[in-house]
């Protein structure tokens, strides 16, 4: 899976912790199992928070580009 053709997209540019993760959680609640969410963020804490959220909430971190901002993540709802 790459960053192309996600089912949903979330722009969290300019938001700071804890807002990005709260928005991810709200977006994923509305999704069906197996759908993907592309997250674009510039808060450095997301490099830690998004992977931790996936582990804790049993979602799959499909792709991650966190070398420099803007950071990009693709999360699949469910495992």
From Swiss-Prot:
The active site is at residue 17. The keyword Disulfide bond does not apply. GO terms for biological process: tRNA wobble position uridine thiolation. It comes from the Bacteria. GO terms for molecular function: sulfur carrier activity. CDD domains: SirA (cd03423). Its main location: cytoplasm. Keywords: Cytoplasm. It is found in: Cytoplasm. GO terms for cellular component: cytoplasm. SUPFAM superfamilies: SirA-like. Pfam families: TusA. Sulfur carrier protein which probably makes part of a sulfur-relay system. Belongs to the sulfur carrier protein TusA family. HAMAP family: Thiourid_synth_A (MF_00413). PANTHER family: SULFUR CARRIER PROTEIN TUSA, SULFUR CARRIER PROTEIN YEDF-RELATED. This is Sulfur carrier protein TusA. It comes from Pseudoalteromonas translucida (strain TAC 125).
């Amino acid at each position: 899976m790459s960053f192309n053709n996600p089912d949903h997209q979330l722009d969290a540019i300019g938001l700071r912790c804890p807002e990005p993760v709260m928005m991810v959680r709200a977006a994923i609640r509305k999704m069906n199992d197996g759908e993907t969410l592309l997250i674009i963020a510039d808060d450095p804490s997301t490099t830690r928070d998004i992977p931790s959220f996936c582990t804790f909430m049993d979602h799959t971190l499909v792709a991650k580009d966190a070398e420099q901002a803007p950071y990009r993540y693709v999360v699949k709802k469910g495992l």
